[in-house]
Structure formats: C-alpha cells, structure tokens
Amino acid sequence: MSKIKEIVLDTETTGLDPYPTDTNPIGHRVIEIGAVELLGHVPTGKTFHQYVNPERSVPKESTMIHGLTNEDLSDKPTFQMIADDFLTFINGGVLIIHNAEFDLKFLNCELKKANKDDLSNFDFIDTLKLARKKFPSRQNSLDALASRFGIDRSARKDFHGALVDTNILSKVYLELIGGSQPDFTLDNIQQKKTSINTENNYTGQRSKKLTKRLKEDEIKAHSDFIKSIGGEKKWNY
C-alpha cells in the first residue's frame, strides 16, 4: 500500500532576512535545520537534525529566541558541507512547514550559495495557511495551535529549536488535516477523492543525481491530496 512521504521541516536563523540590506550588508543565515519524516502522515522515526556554522555573527536578539551563540556554532559544519545530506533526506517528500515563505526563502538562499538547485520543484503545505482557513479569527502561531490541540510544548518553553518545533508541528499538522490516522494512505485518498540523525555526519558531494521515486498512480493520488487540503503545487514530476 503506497503512502505519501512528507517532511515536516523547520529552521532557526540569525535573523529575519537572508538578503543583504543597508543595515545588514551580509544577510542572515540558517543556523539549525530540523526535519521529521512521515509516511501516510505517521512519523517513521527518521529525522534530520543539524546545527550550522553561519559564517557570520549571531545577534544577541536572535540568541534570546533560540539560545544558540557564536561559540555554540563555531565548530559546526557550514551549510555547503551538509547541503547534500539535507537534500537526500527530503528527496521525494512533500514539505510541511509553518509559515513556509520564511523557511523556503532562507533555504533557497543557502542552496544558491552552495551552488545547489533550490526547492522550487517541491510541493509544500503551509500549516499556517491551513490553520488560518480552519481558524480564521484566532491566533495561529505554533504555540497557540499546540495549546488548542492539547499538544505538549514544554520542550520549547525556554527556547525555540528546529527539531523540537518539527516534532510539535508534525502533531499539529495531523490535527489540522483531521487527526492522526495510521491507515491514511494514498490508496485511501484515491478512494475518497480527496532518525536518520545526520548531525556531524555530512558527506560532501552527492554521488549521483536524485531520481523520481513515485509511480504514476501515486503521483495522481498525491496531487489529489495536495489539492484537497489547499497545499501548493511546486513539485516538477
């Protein structure tokens, strides 16, 4: 029975804009990536987690949010060093991101710096947009949604963390699409018409180009699902 591969994804950064500005001439950078794999909307136990040396200083106001300092990141690999491992992990998956525009903007900027293809060929689902459709007049931050659904968020009480946030978001996402259903597979969708922890384990260049993994019937069912919940088609099959 075929199941959709989804990657719940989050980043932490040194600031709000990866592009150079008058007040920030070198742009902000990604300093942490967390990702959790789902199959059929159920966590597989596979994760990607990596702290990243931003090759610039971390502002104090950013440290107050995620708790990461220049010293914490000084011995970590650069994004270019871990880019291939990251791309391998997310390959073939639909990206599930809260406020996707922010994370995709940063990741695409980092990938460009690393001379890699950006994420424009990936489908993605923005859980913030899903939440705003479901709760149009309410607060829809990750904290607010976790509280609304009774999901434990004590792990992010002091600081935000990419892997902590993806674990919370994976549970929030399942609630937003109708609750955790282990048998919610591609076959079900057709009928209804609707850890690898890689920290400090980067390998450099990918040995061969990534290949398409979905069959034609899986692609159609996957497309139906994306449409049914208001996801955005970006994946070039």
Where are these regions (language model features)?
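Short, well-ordered coil↔helix boundary/capping segments
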Residues: 136, 160-163, 216
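Conserved non-catalytic scaffold segment of RNase H-like nuclease domains
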Residues: 1-122, 132-135, 144-159
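Alpha-helix initiation and N-capping motif
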Residues: 83, 139-142, 219-222
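Acidic, Mg2+-coordinating catalytic module of metal-dependent nucleases/exonucleases
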Residues: 94-97, 106, 110-111, 141-201
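Acidic two-metal-ion nuclease catalytic site recognized across multiple nuclease folds
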Residues: 1, 175-237
